[in-house]
UniProtKB/Swiss-Prot annotation:
Residues 1-42 are annotated as: Disordered. It holds the Pfam family AP2. Keywords: Activator, DNA-binding, Ethylene signaling pathway, Nucleus, Transcription, Transcription regulation. This is Ethylene-responsive transcription factor ERF039. InterPro entries: AP2/ERF_dom, AP2/ERF_dom_sf, AP2/ERF_TF_ERF_subfamily, DNA-bd_dom_sf. It comes from Arabidopsis thaliana. Residues 39-96 bind DNA. The gene is ERF039. PANTHER family: ETHYLENE-RESPONSIVE TRANSCRIPTION FACTOR ERF039 (PTHR31985:SF233), ETHYLENE-RESPONSIVE TRANSCRIPTION FACTOR ERF042-RELATED (PTHR31985). Probably acts as a transcriptional activator. Binds to the GCC-box pathogenesis-related promoter element. May be involved in the regulation of gene expression by stress factors and by components of stress signal transduction pathways. It is found in: Nucleus. GO terms for biological process: ethylene-activated signaling pathway.
Length: 179
């Protein structure tokens, strides 16, 4: 009797085996969370390969259509502009490092947001380098300048420069418009 009750309790603890109800619409990689395309907030890919972006207006069912774009990064930048305009500093951005460089819409009107989003998507933004990735002055870079010939004239060395300055008369002003 004890064996049957322990057997029943084990059966209840197991999760039920899901029934297969046909083919899954997702590939194995998508089911595992692995995707070939980048995944940005507010961006999705159409079946024919174009990327679209839209954002939901707060406290409304409607969405603001931001456009169709050729790359997911363009669509993500458009979404970031709209998110900043609608949600302000609490917005979740795809590229937070570009937040201060993105165009701002003239107003919160959907038309203005769409125009600013299109402008942000059209520009090829390069992410600003982080402080850790900036190149500091190194001895190798300094050596490149030390190998150059001394092109600047030493004004204290009058022996070398006497003939050079004699070609410019003191009484005639030097005007660039004569050349």
């Amino acid at each position: 009797m004890q064996d049957s009750s322990s057997h029943e309790s084990q059966r209840n603890l197991r999760s039920p085996v899901p029934e297969k109800t046909g083919k899954s619409s997702k590939t194995k990689n998508e089911q595992k969370g692995v995707s070939k395309q980048p995944n940005f907030r507010g961006v999705r890919m159409r079946q024919w390969g174009k990327w679209v972006s839209e954002i939901r207006e707060p406290r409304k069912k409607s969405r603001i259509w931001l456009g169709t774009f050729s790359t997911p990064e363009m669509a993500a930048r458009a979404h970031d502009v709209a998110a900043l305009a609608i949600k302000g500093g609490s917005a979740h951005l795809n590229f937070p490092e570009l937040a201060y460089h993105l165009p701002r819409p003239a107003s919160a009107d959907p038309k203005d947001i769409q125009e600013a989003a299109a402008a942000a998507a059209a520009v090829d933004w390069k992410a600003p380098e982080s402080p850790s990735s900036t190149v500091t002055s190194s001895p190798v870079a300094d050596d490149a300048f030390s190998d150059l010939p001394d092109l600047l004239l030493d004004v204290n060395d009058h022996n070398k420069n006497d003939g050079f300055w004699d070609s410019f008369p003191y009484e005639d002003p030097f005007f660039l418009e004569n050349y």
